[in-house]
Amino acid sequence: DVYKRQILAREDKDLHADIVIGVPDSSLSAAIGYAEEAGIPFETGLIKNRYVGRTFIQPTQAMRDRSVRLKLSPVSSVVKGKSIVMIDDSIVRGTTSRRIVQLLKDAGATQVHVRIASPVITSPCFYGVDTSTKDQLIGAQMSVEEIRDYIHADTLRFMTEEEMKEATHGVGLCLACFNGEYCTKLFSYQEELDK
């Protein structure tokens, strides 16, 4: 994990920002490591409501939107007037990222540079995460630039699949949601219907 966050910061040598923040809780270690590697101060810029669960797994868009509004609050005294690097672990549907960027800008952030500590999710996960079709995944529908525009980030960068392999040494790593290469044969209803 330490190496992973160093790799993400390594590519941003020309990025000038005032602070680095992480989206609680899953990306805090990546944000701290990014800040150390980039030489940019880490700050707590978002406070999490501990009584709201994972937003991207809510069954409807309306529920996801409501959960995001309840889940995170920006710390205005930390973000106001600052150019921010915001680290998150992934972008699944884009709902959470879009709302967080807007929250930070509404709280006075001058710029929000989003860095994602995983590759673009382009394929469904059939191993326990509620993303059963590609049409639910923003990464399967849009380019990185289109995602950046959609979430209103000033810049956006994802870790590449190669960087993830390098950071984790590829040991026991499932990359199916990033590259569509599943480690088990998947059942196809369509193939059965076509028989």
Describe these PLM feature segments.
Residues V2-Y3:
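Short, small-residue-biased leader/transition segments that mark boundaries at the very start
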Residues L8, V20, Y34, V112:
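Conserved hydrophobic/aromatic pocket- or pore-lining residues that grip, position, or stack substrates
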Residues L15-S26:
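Short glycine-rich phosphate-binding loop at a beta-alpha junction
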Residues I19, V85, H113-R115:
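A structural signal for isolated positions on well-ordered beta-strands in alpha/beta enzyme cores
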Residues D25, G33-A35:
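Active-site diphosphate/adenylate-binding microenvironment
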Residues G39-V85, T95, T122-S132:
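Short, glycine/charge-rich flexible loops or terminal/linker lids adjacent to PRPP-binding catalytic cores
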Residues I84-L104:
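A phosphate-binding catalytic loop at a beta-strand-loop-alpha-helix junction
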Residues Q102-K195:
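PRPP-dependent phosphoribosyltransferase catalytic core
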